């Protein structure tokens, strides 16, 4: 009888086929028919059923037939879900049946998002389906996905990306507020504006940082024009951003550090006016803690100026400051609990090219940091005598951003991949660099993604 020799894209991928929402797919099986017969002597069925059927005994949802053709050409209209698909080839005369069963996964359009704009200032988002960080990823770039889902519309004056699974909303913050999308479909929320996110009227529209912390009681924090707003989702009736300053006077830096270990607090911010750390607890309340020890988190040397703040290992917050002559130092502190624990105060002046550093990020699985000049990235293990050259970009390229891949559900690569965005004229490029999560040293493995415009931000969406 007929023999299904292969289904390209399926049998060569471990009998699994992964496609995207709204994608048009085509599967062309290689079938060897019984001698003396042709395709006309057979009937073909593409039979699909869910891997986790919903319902109760005798009332489970039923399977469906996608097509009754030799090849499958199908427009995905379903939401993300895991199915089984069986390709059946039946001899019309003898009834003999041959079949091939495989996993049929409809995946959300997730991956490494790149926000860019062209020379005219028209912005869009592109999703890198990197094979290492996306199940079923094949390295393709799903381009212009905002305009594809919004009638060709482009974004203007975009700044950075944010995500709130609680709503669920995907945000692209801009000079004028935000583009607010359904986090699954990437379609704009109708008649919803940046102002609608707040329970107060803003004096100035100036989004500077946003972070959703899905721990404890699910807190969303936003900095607008150096003022801190939050939503404590577990508090009854609290669904919009409110100013949580109370009586505190401060000027918040454009950074929010999540705390992803158990404790009293969910986020850390920094007051540039009074040189002190601020915390947001799991209920959405703002505090200005103090401490003893190596340094007082509520009174950092007033001669120092804020440079950068980010998440470190085991819930630590790492802060870089500079003095009047430009010398850099780093403050490490654990602010997870109501009683802060200063960890270390480190001088960075001895590190190679540190005076030319323009970008920073910290390890979340090891005690090290990356810092970048315009063309080179260094890795430094805390307390080490010197830093190691980690990565250099191509000739004529300028590093414009670097971000760590952080995904707690990925036990293999979480905190082990650095994405680096570069610019050469109006052409943007993204490098993916895998490194040792304990030492911060490069594995020597890197990959390039090209075809972008002027890159404004990068963000991982699962």
Predicted regions and their residues:
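Acidic/polar, low-complexity intrinsically disordered N-terminal segments immediately downstream
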Residues: 1-144, 410-415, 422-462
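Signature of short aromatic-glycine-proline-rich micro-motifs recurring in repeat-based ectodomains
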Residues: 155-162, 168, 210, 399-407, ...
């Amino acid at each position: 009888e007929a023999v299904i020799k292969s289904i390209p894209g399926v049998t060569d991928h471990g009998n699994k086929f992964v496609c995207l929402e709204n994608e048009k797919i085509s599967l062309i099986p290689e079938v060897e028919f019984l001698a003396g017969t042709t395709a006309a002597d057979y009937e073909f069925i593409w039979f699909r059923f869910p891997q986790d059927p919903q319902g109760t005994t005798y009332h489970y949802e039923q399977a469906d037939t996608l097509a009754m053709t030799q090849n499958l050409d199908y427009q995905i209209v379903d939401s993300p879900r895991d199915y089984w698909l069986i390709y059946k080839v039946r001899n019309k005369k003898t009834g003999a049946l041959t079949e091939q069963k495989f996993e049929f996964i409809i995946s959300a359009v997730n991956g490494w998002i790149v926000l860019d704009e062209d020379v005219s200032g028209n912005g869009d988002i592109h999703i890198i389906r990197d094979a290492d960080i996306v199940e079923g990823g094949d390295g393709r770039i799903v381009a212009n996905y905002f305009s594809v889902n919004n009638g060709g519309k482009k974004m203007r004056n975009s700044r950075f990306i944010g995500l709130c699974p609680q709503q669920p909303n995907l945000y692209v913050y801009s000079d004028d507020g935000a583009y607010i999308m359904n986090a699954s479909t990437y379609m704009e929320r109708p008649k919803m504006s940046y102002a609608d996110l707040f329970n107060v009227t803003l004096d100035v529209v100036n989004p500077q940082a946003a972070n959703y912390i899905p721990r404890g009681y699910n807190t969303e924090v936003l900095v607008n024009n150096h003022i801190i707003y939050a939503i404590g989702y577990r508090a009854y009736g609290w669904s919009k951003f409110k100013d949580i300053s109370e009586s505190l006077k401060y000027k918040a830096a454009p950074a929010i550090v999540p705390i992803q270990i158990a404790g009293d607090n969910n986020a850390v911010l920094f007051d540039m006016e009074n040189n002190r750390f601020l915390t947001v607890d799991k209920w959405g309340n703002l505090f200005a803690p103090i401490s003893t020890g190596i340094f007082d988190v509520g009174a950092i040397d007033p001669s120092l100026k804020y440079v950068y703040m980010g998440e470190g290992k085991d819930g630590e917050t790492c802060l870089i400051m500079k003095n009047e002559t430009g010398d850099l130092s780093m403050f490490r502190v654990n602010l997870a609990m109501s009683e802060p624990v200063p960890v270390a105060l480190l001088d960075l002046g001895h590190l190679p090219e540190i005076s030319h550093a323009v970008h920073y990020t910290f390890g979340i699985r090891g005690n090290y940091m990356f810092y970048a000049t315009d063309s080179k990235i260094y890795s430094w293990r805390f307390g080490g005598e010197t830093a190691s050259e980690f990565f250099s970009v191509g000739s004529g390229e300028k590093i414009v951003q670097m971000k760590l891949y952080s995904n707690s559900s990925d036990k293999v690569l979480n905190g082990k991949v650095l994405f680096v965005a570069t610019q050469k004229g109006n052409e943007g490029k993204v490098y993916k660099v895998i490194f040792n999560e304990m030492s911060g040293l490069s594995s020597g493995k890197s990959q390039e993604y090209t075809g972008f415009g002027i890159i404004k931000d990068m963000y991982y969406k699962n």
